[in-house]
Amino acid sequence: MSEDVYYGIFDDLIGKHLRDSLIYRYDAQKNNHEYTPFRHHYDPNTERLLGEFMRKYIFMYAYSESEVIKANEKGRLRDLEKAAKFALEERLPRRKGASNGLYSELLLDLLITLYTNNVNKLATRAIYRQHSDNQEIKGYDGLHISVDSQENKNLWLGQAKMGRRSYCVSDIKKDLNGKANMLYTADQLFFIADKEERTLPKALELLEMINDVSWDNRTLSIDERATKLSELFEKENVNVFFICLLAYDRPSIYELEDKLDNEILEEIKSIQSTYEEEFKDLISNEYEVLLWVIPIRDLQLLRESMGI
């Protein structure tokens, strides 16, 4: 399967160097929403190494799975630094500074790839933009589809924040409560479904259904078309996940290595108390909100080490 080939390439080049060595995932805690804490390694060199691997992942972030497989076959991934430079020039918007959303969007995509094994990249902001004026599509920070061995269809709608803790917490709340609705979702999905031909076959099957809804109902208002999309999700039993990444500066958590696990668990309790009563009635279909939280000791060093 192409998925197996893609994940094999990823694991060889990136995954095996990060999983449970530079990045650790804890068990998820589930109440009204699901909360998954992460942390990075304690060694003071960790943020630099993590930033360097994030840079090496840029090509895999900016290109679809099938394109990555083809590039690997042609030997283009032997030097991931060159591949990253190419992707930055050809696929990524020219954004600089701490406000550059690429840092958080790429880290979300990296963690999804690192800790799942059947999620197909449907869109990142990197994939669709107008080269002439460098305008990006407006929508979720990441969009993925997974179809498991039982043919269950899962749609992952991503929002990612990186920066101060207060900013990350408040903006995730604002984005989900303000944007995560079927109208907003339909607008992006219809745009992509009309253009995407590079993702893997199972994801394309669902995309084709979405494109059919768009075409068959093109004379209707966007609100009516969004309702038709909701009906498709119901008919096809599409599971919707709003996956949110909060990656924020929190050096105090890493002060004492032997207390690190407890500090992380206390941190997730605080996040949970903030969000438990939020994100109700986002869409009419059933959905889950997944909150992935990774405190970072030196966020500035991580960004600088990405070199973008």
Walk through the language-model features, giving the residues of each:
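A short, highly charged nucleic-acid-interacting micro-segment common to nuclease
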Residues: 85-109, 129-132
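Conserved catalytic cores of phosphodiester-cleaving nucleases, focusing on short active-site segments
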Residues: 112, 142-144, 155-162
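Extended, charged low-complexity segments
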Residues: 255-308
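Charged, often glycine-rich, active-site loop that binds/positions anionic groups
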Residues: 83-87, 131-144
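Short, solvent-exposed loop/turn segments that connect beta-strands within catalytic domains
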Residues: 120, 148-153
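Acidic, metal/cofactor-coordinating or nucleic-acid-engaging core segments within structured domains
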Residues: 170-245, 251-258, 262
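A structured, charge-rich N-terminal accessory region that forms the first stable segment of a protein
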Residues: 2-85
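A short acidic/basic microdomain associated with nuclease active sites
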Residues: 115-135
